[in-house]
Curated annotation (Swiss-Prot):
Gene expressing this chain: MTC6
Organism whose genome encodes this protein: Candida albicans (strain SC5314 / ATCC MYA-2876) (Yeast)
Ranges per topology, Cytoplasmic: 580-614
The keyword Iron-sulfur is assigned to this record: no
Cell compartment(s), UniProt: Membrane
Extracellular topological segments: 18-558
Signal peptide: 1-17
Protein name: Maintenance of telomere capping protein 6
PANTHER family: MAINTENANCE OF TELOMERE CAPPING PROTEIN 6, MAINTENANCE OF TELOMOERE CAPPING
Length: 614
């Protein structure tokens, strides 16, 4: 019986484990290298204003237009969110017939019928185009996916900052005698018909309200920051500034004062912003009127401007060329870089079927300050499932980072294009008598160097040039071509006065450093202040003794899934033990007691002595 109990409990542990897996996933598992790259770039960018932290996004129109406007078309979204896609662009239509926001570009006739209860897809036409739409589809379908992803990644280690971007459009008609027939077709007449849609813009994101960084929160931050600045009468000297203060001081000169990623993501615990990036609603008496409630939740261009560029024209390339060539024989044009760094705006570049992104063009856009939005329908040709990543991930994963080179961060064993050691691995240290001794053949692939392709994990004992950054001007760098150090020997005193050993924390800072390399005509690799010496794959700045800020954490949902299998198995085992104790009969033991009782009775009957035996 005991062995039977053990076998049954073992079976339960496997079966329950399949019911309550440790990690429920509707998309592909993200490989370790990609996950480390995502987290480390995010960590490096923590002091940077949130509007200048780069991200990549996807336009949902590419799924809807190729697969129809239904919830099934959103099946790839969760997988894309796990693959470093942090933005979702949505075309949102104001239906002037029903006065509701909807995702389908065409109005639904009021006499609409469905073929089956499970299949509610109907063909609807508008402006000489026909669409396949589900009348039940609404923004709640999108927001529930985002909400689930946010809940599953709501830890300091996994949390990322996201963007929901709206393109507002109208299902518009001109009021005239000829349009009475249209109103008879499309205006709601049957009160029993459940017209799906949202009454206000604010309603479209209500499922995510607790996670949204709003214009109201921005105003509170700006008010507090201005009071602090105005009340501070002390003069900060360059030497007394730490890096965080230096970054704050530089970006406080921005056109709009925005909080840092650290403040919003890890202090206020907000996970996303909602923007109206374009407003193409028709002017009409039936048009939607933006309310104060909408303005309290959603960013419009008056709060934070958005600039949208398209790959089918050269306007997006102009800024990239200007920054890449912003130098001459004597110095780098720092003013050009500062103009971009201090301009608070959302810079988006959107591709299409005629001019889709290439690996080369994508890397260029990301490095010069654009946030790419994938909009070509070729990206929707394959389902994203467990073990089957998206086309975006397979072809462009390495190009979505302004920081890391392709295949990084990775050690030399797994690296494809790593820069190999070219110098003698020799460093000097002092013994107990103060005499210098040479120490050779040291290998520690724990430090990060800048190469022409981006950041690479390199041997800390290699002697390279090192990047010195101006404390008060984030895009100004110095590279001493005559001084090379291994990573452990670099000190701030090795940099010119007013500079310190540092690293780029944004795409524009990265591009300004790479432009300085070209201007000063020095060779890669170049050390930057980043390493994972103390904890593997936890990349930190601050020298070789900088500590990893993370502990092993799990979300509440994951914790429940972790303990659920053990809890269920334990309860079943306890129930079985209880049943055994209460209902099990042991006839062998019962017979044994009866036999010995009879034997003893017969013995005393035959040997019945009187008195005390002698």
């Amino acid at each position: 019986m005991t062995s039977l109990l053990f076998a049954f409990s073992l079976f339960l542990s496997f079966s329950v484990g399949s019911i309550f897996p440790f990690s429920i996933s509707n998309g592909p598992a993200v490989n370790d290298t990609l996950q480390n790259a995502i987290r480390s770039q995010r960590d490096v960018s923590k002091p940077i204003p949130i509007d200048r932290v780069g991200f990549s996004g996807v336009s949902l129109s590419l799924f809807f237009e190729s697969e129809g406007y239904s919830s099934d078309s959103l099946s790839n979204l969760n997988g894309l969110l796990k693959e470093n896609v942090d933005g979702v662009m949505i075309d949102l239509y104001w239906n002037e017939f029903t006065s509701k926001w909807q995702l389908c570009p065409a109005p639904f006739p009021n006499n609409i019928t469905y073929t089956t209860a499970s299949n509610r897809i109907v063909d609807v036409s508008w402006n000489n185009k026909t669409y396949k739409c589900d009348p039940n589809l609404s923004t709640d379908n999108i927001m529930s996916i985002l909400n689930s992803f946010i809940r599953d990644t709501n830890t300091d280690v996994e949390a990322n900052f996201m963007h929901v971007m709206y393109n507002l459009k109208s299902i518009h008609y001109e009021k005239s005698n000829q349009t009475i027939s249209l109103e008879n077709i499309y205006k709601e007449k049957n009160s029993n018909l459940n017209v799906v849609g949202m009454d206000t813009l604010n309603d479209t994101v209500s499922l995510l309200s607790s996670y949204i960084f709003t214009p109201t929160l921005l105003k509170q931050y700006q008010s507090t920051s201005n009071k602090y600045t105005n009340s501070s009468s002390s003069i900060r000297y360059i030497d007394s500034l730490n890096e965080t203060q230096a970054i704050q001081d530089f970006y406080s000169q921005s056109t709009i004062l925005m909080p840092s990623l650290q403040t919003v993501l890890l202090t206020q615990y907000k996970r996303l912003m909602v923007h109206v990036v374009t407003n193409d609603m028709a002017e009409s008496s039936r048009s939607y009127q933006i309310s104060s409630s909408d303005k309290d939740t959603i960013f419009f261009n008056s709060d934070l401007p958005a600039s949208i560029f398209h790959t089918d024209n050269a306007s997006a390339d102009e800024l990239c060329y200007e920054l890449s060539d912003a130098y001459n024989g004597t110095d780098v044009n720092i003013a050009e870089f500062n103009k971009v760094s201090l301009n608070a705006t959302l810079r988006l570049v959107v591709d299409d079927d005629k001019t889709p992104f290439t690996t080369k063009s994508l890397s260029k856009y990301v490095r010069c300050g654009y946030c790419p939005i994938f909009n070509s329908t070729e990206y929707s040709s394959q389902k994203v499932t467990e073990g089957n990543s998206s086309i975006i991930s397979r072809e462009f994963a390495s190009n979505l980072f302004w920081s890391w080179a392709p295949g990084q961060p990775s050690g030399p064993d797994n690296c494809i294009n790593c820069t190999r050691p070219t110098t003698n691995n020799t460093s000097k240290h002092s013994d107990d008598n103060g005499e210098e001794e040479e120490e050779g053949n040291n290998i520690a692939y724990k430090c990060v160097a800048l190469t022409e392709e981006g950041w690479e994990v390199s041997n800390c004992y290699e002697k390279y040039l090192f990047a010195c950054q101006n404390k008060l001007s984030r895009n100004e760098w110095k590279l001493n071509n005559s001084t090379k150090r291994n990573y452990f020997d670099i000190d701030d005193d090795d940099c010119p006065e007013g500079y310190f050993f540092s690293l780029p924390r944004s795409n524009i800072e990265m591009l300004s450093l790479m432009t300085t390399v070209k201007q000063e005509n020095v060779n890669y690799p170049i050390w930057i202040d980043l390493n994972d010496i103390t904890v593997e794959n936890c990349f930190v700045s601050g020298g070789p003794y900088a500590q990893c800020p993370y502990q092993e954490t799990v979300t509440t949902d994951k914790f429940v899934r972790m303990i659920a299998p053990s809890f269920v198995v334990a309860m079943v085992v306890l129930v079985l033990i209880f049943i055994e104790k209460v209902f099990r009969k042991t006839p062998i033991q019962t017979n044994r007691k009866r036999y010995w009782k009879k034997a003893i009775h017969e013995y005393y009957a035959k040997n019945d002595y009187e008195g005390v035996p002698s």
